[in-house]
């Protein structure tokens, strides 16, 4: 494996810039997302129905905008300029939320700015893949270390978000997020490289080959949506399941999430290290096997000790699919890293939308335990689908 460090320079400054940019954008996002429902309820005085509608519209807008942008990002323009534009939209969005309490403004202009801002992260990973390929670096390990920065950001961001919002107010929270995006703009402008485009795979007629026309890409997308539906159902339902059904302390939910997020980081790095030797498909199947054990354990065990122990399987599941899953899309769509990365992130967003509907319906009609039995079945289905995707 080609090292990320060189003999001439102990640390590659471009590598550090990618790490810093992904971490800071991740922290800025992790500052805003965890307390958004609280902000809408307390500051905007939105009813629960309008809070749910905001999240749904926001997710759908993010999918639509990212698909439209990704279609053009691989064929024209400077990808770094696009990232700068998206970060500028994120900066404006943070300022809007800091000083506006009008629901209609937030669900229209705010959602539009948020959708444009959400493109920044997949485009940074696409630029990183192009840089790694051009400079003959190990793309898998490079992307895995970058993805670990996001996990680290989500270890730090949520507790900091609640601390800022509850102790200093939401204006301070969103101003801090805006400041982080401003620093990111300067960092990206002066440190990230512009990388010449690779030629995308073409179909007869001279047009780029759509990922949807590829059976393996379609199958992997459906499998990825299924995986992220499982994960999001767990995130939504777990705090309620622990406190209402199991009667365990509410603070345990935060401890479980923090433990899993912390364990994901070494899992991602190990997956990146062994990806070339083991193969991406085999790693994804290992992740899904861990996911199957995780959801089966949630359905069958109820003690605090068991739930903590199960987080190891959860970390293996999410730690691998979050990093290797994205790289698998990129390898299946050569020359189109922007579209491939966006397809991966859209599978996450689609899973989030489906999970919200499914979790609410199941838990209300059949109880919280039904959510985990369904997640188990979906994980098995995702395993079967992933096993049929080409190993590249």
Question: Which residues does each predicted region cover?
Answer:
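Hydrophobic core of transmembrane alpha-helices in multi-pass small-molecule transporters
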Residues: 23, 104-121, 225, 306-320
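Helix-loop boundary and gating motifs at the non-cytosolic
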Residues: 5-59, 231-242
